[in-house]
Amino acid sequence: MYFQHQFSSLNLNSFLPEGILIFNIIFILILDLVSQKENKSMLVKISFIGLLLSMLTLIQQWYHESTIAFLGSFEVNHFTTCFRLIISLCCILCIPLSFEYIKCSGIRLTEFIIFLLFTTLGAMILSSANDLITIFISLECLGLGSYLLTGYVKKDIRSNEAGMKYLIIGGTSSSIFAYGLSWLYGLSGGSIYLKSIAYSFSHLNPSYSLASWFAYICIIVGIGFKLSLVPFHRWSPDVYEGSPTPVVAFLSIISKAGALALTIRISDIIFPILEQDSNSILQILAILSMIVGNLLAMVETSMKRILTYSSIAQAGYLLIGIVAGRNNGYASLLVYMIFYLFMNIGAFSCIILFGLRTGTDQIRDYTGLYTKDPWLASCLSLCLLSLAGIPPLTGFFGKILLFWSAWQSGFYFLVMTGIFTSIVSIYYYIRIVKFLVVAKEKDISYYVKKYSTYKSNSLMKQNPIELNIYLCTFISGFVGIFMNPVIYFAQQSILK
């Protein structure tokens, strides 16, 4: 009876989406062991089915009340479920990109898919982790999978270098983060659960306020590296440039989603007593990230590096939602995160498709693409302009919601900085569009002149990347006009 009671108290149903992913990983491993030849299409179908089942379970959980699983180590509520949905959706959208990239590169898909699912699993657990040990282990799962994906193409020296850099920087940031967690553990008198630590902090002797500040700064520095916030961003352009492009698309979303969920939970549960001062730190990081990310993107010539610096600036915009605070602030962050997922993956899908057909990602090599492939050029332009926040595209409405929530909370300088940097970002996005639509024959690049494409009239025979582009471009371009259901979903995730 005692064992039965303990087992029922684990609430394993709450962990079912992650359990499906674990089963999926094990099944793919067993399938690879018993198969004589790698069946790439079968692997993609299996991973798709697992992720879709996981998403369906998450949608079902969203309609249920909050629960605590694994004796307090794992909390499931509407807010964490929303982030887990974003993470699993990101993985679903990145699998077609990976399949085509791996097929053209001639390397094994099995391990790549396993690392992709493993990283997704780490990010999902991180979003719902409720104690210090689970937080650190899930963060390391996310990090370890990221390092392996970054350096996956062993024959490419740039990929090897990127993987090694990421491993060293990631290990350093994890050490700083773990040091901050150890201070939380000590200051709380040996508690590992977030709410127990928060209770201890509410009764903390004022003489220990400096120590709690030190713990907070260590944690924010560790998370800052994961989010590529300025001044912790120096590693990301080099690492992302050397990584396989589908990995860059995947990590630019999934690391942000997991790290932002963790930041909100730690700031909201443990450090509400530091709310005003901690907001000052987050404001500074947001302002620096928006300014530096957009300014450095203006001088880049590689599409991957431009989108890397753009992702640094986007992390700054997303921080505005945390600074703005509960309800409206967090809801606007969730809405923009959903929109950013589709805008970013849509842009990367276009870059991957062009790269697979030409072998380049330099901006000037896109010159005149509209004359050869108007569909791809139009989709890429739409996704980039949406990232810039040009009305009436989806990105514009997402940014307006973020800025309005911060303005209502009184962060006027932060909002003005966000508006100014958004205007600056239009320059480098428009510059890319300008290259795409060049019509003069003499200006068309060598790669575009040699560019060839095949488009099937049948939807079922379309390239998987093209299907991705259809979906992401539609959402990036038009969903913002009808965004009320998305806002309702985000607000309900916060209010409940």
UniProtKB/Swiss-Prot annotation:
On whether Chloroplast is a keyword of this UniProt record, the answer is: yes
Taxonomically, the superkingdom here is Eukaryota
Source organism of this protein record: Chara vulgaris
Q: Does the keyword Membrane apply?
A: yes
Q: What does this protein do?
A: NDH shuttles electrons from NAD(P)H:plastoquinone, via FMN and iron-sulfur (Fe-S) centers, to quinones in the photosynthetic chain and possibly in a chloroplast respiratory chain. The immediate electron acceptor for the enzyme in this species is believed to be plastoquinone. Couples the redox reaction to proton translocation, and thus conserves the redox energy in a proton gradient.
Q: Which GO terms describe its cellular component?
A: chloroplast thylakoid membrane
Record-level GO BP terms = ATP synthesis coupled electron transport; photosynthesis, light reaction
Using the UniProt record, name the top-level EC class of this enzyme in a single word.
translocase
> What is the protein's given name?
NAD(P)H-quinone oxidoreductase subunit 2, chloroplastic
- Keywords assigned by UniProt, alphabetized: Chloroplast, Membrane, NAD, NADP, Plastid, Plastoquinone, Quinone, Thylakoid, Translocase, Transmembrane, Transmembrane helix, Transport
Q: Which InterPro entries match?
A: NADH-Q_OxRdtase_suN/2, ND/Mrp_TM, Ndh2_N
The protein's Enzyme Commission number? 7.1.1.-
**Family classification:** Belongs to the complex I subunit 2 family.
Complex and partners: NDH is composed of at least 16 different subunits, 5 of which are encoded in the nucleus.
Annotated localization: Plastid, Chloroplast thylakoid membrane
Residues passing through the membrane, by range: 14-34, 42-62, 79-99, 109-129, 133-153, 167-187, 210-230, 244-264, 281-301, 305-325, 334-354, 377-397, 400-420, 469-489
Q: What is the lineage of its organism?
A: Eukaryota, Viridiplantae, Streptophyta, Charophyceae, Charales
Query: Which catalysed reactions does the entry list for this protein?
Result: a plastoquinone + NADH + (n+1) H(+)(in) = a plastoquinol + NAD(+) + n H(+)(out); a plastoquinone + NADPH + (n+1) H(+)(in) = a plastoquinol + NADP(+) + n H(+)(out)
Q: Per its record, what are the GO molecular function terms?
A: NADH dehydrogenase (ubiquinone) activity; quinone binding
Q: How does it sit in the membrane?
A: Multi-pass membrane protein
Q: Which Pfam families match?
A: Ndh2_N (PF19530), Proton_antipo_M (PF00361)
Alphabetical list of PANTHER family matching this protein: NADH DEHYDROGENASE
